[in-house]
Regions:
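N-terminal Rossmann NAD(P)H-binding glycine-rich loop of SDR-like oxidoreductase domains
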Residues: 1-10
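Anion (oxyanion) recognition and catalysis
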Residues: 6, 26, 111, 115
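Conserved beta-strand segments of alpha/beta enzyme cores
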Residues: 11, 31, 120-123
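NAD(P)H-binding glycine-rich loop region in Rossmannoid oxidoreductase-like domains
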Residues: 14, 19-76, 81
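Conserved Rossmann-fold NAD(P)-dependent oxidoreductase catalytic core, especially the SDR/UDP-sugar
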Residues: 76-117, 122, 126
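Alpha-helical elements of Rossmann-like donor-binding domains used by nucleotide-donor carbohydrate transfer enzymes
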Residues: 42, 77, 109, 137-141
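Short, charged/polar "capping" segments at the starts of alpha-helices
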Residues: 20-24, 98-103, 131
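Glycine-rich phosphate/pyrophosphate-binding loop and the adjoining helix
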Residues: 127-155
Length: 155
C-alpha cells in the first residue's frame, strides 16, 4: 500500500517495531521509523507532519495481552491524543489474523472517536490475504479521507 501512495505522489512514513525491518521499508521508497503501537508516545512523536494515520495491525503478532491492548485501550488512548495533533484522518484495518473480537472492539473505538471528537475515520474490512483488493480498499479509504482523486492521477 505504501508503494501505491508513493506512486500517487504522497510522502509515506512506514513504521515498524523491529529495527531490522527498516531496510524493507526504505526499499519500498518510504521513510522508515521505529515505533511501537503498545507505546502511544512512540507513535505520537511521529505525527507532527502527518495527514493520515493508518493502524495496520489486523494481522499483528505478539503476546495476546499486547494484541488486545493495541486494539483496545492503547488504540483508545491514541485516538484521544490525536485530537491535539495536525492529523486529519485515521484508517483502521479491521481484518486479518487477529481475533475477530479484538478487531471489532478496535473498529468500535475508532467509530466512537469519530463521533466524539469529529476525527475523520475509515474502517477497512477487506481481507489482507487478498493483497490487490486490500490495497485498493486502503487507497480508496485514503481518497475518502483526503477528498478528491489520487495525487498524480491524470484527469
Amino acid at each position: 500500500m505504501g508503494k501505491g501512495l508513493v506512486t500517487a505522489g504522497w510522502q509515506v512514513r512506514g513504521t515498524t517495531r523491529d529495527p531490522g525491518n527498516a531496510e524493507d521499508i526504505l526499499g519500498a521508497r518510504l521513510e522508515a521509523v521505529v515505533a511501537d503501537p503498545d507505546r502511544a508516545a512512540s507513535i505520537l512523536d511521529q505525527v507532527g507532519d502527518v495527514t493520515l494515520v493508518f493502524w495496520l495491525l489486523g494481522s499483528a503478532l505478539g503476546e495476546p495481552e499486547v494484541i488486545a491492548a493495541i486494539h483496545g485501550p492503547r488504540l483508545e488512548g491514541l485516538m484521544q491524543k490525536l485530537v491535539d495533533t495536525p492529523v486529519r484522518g485515521f484508517v483502521y484495518e479491521a481484518a486479518g489474523r487477529v481475533q475477530r473480537r479484538h478487531l471489532e472492539r478496535g473498529a468500535e473505538i475508532v467509530r466512537e472517536a469519530a463521533e466524539r471528537w469529529r476525527i475523520p475515520v475509515q474502517v477497512v474490512t477487506e481481507d489482507p490475504g487478498d493483497w490487490e483488493a486490500w490495497t485498493e480498499a486502503m487507497l480508496t479509504a485514503t481518497e475518502r479521507l483526503i477528498g478528491g482523486a489520487r495525487r498524480g492521477a491524470a484527469g
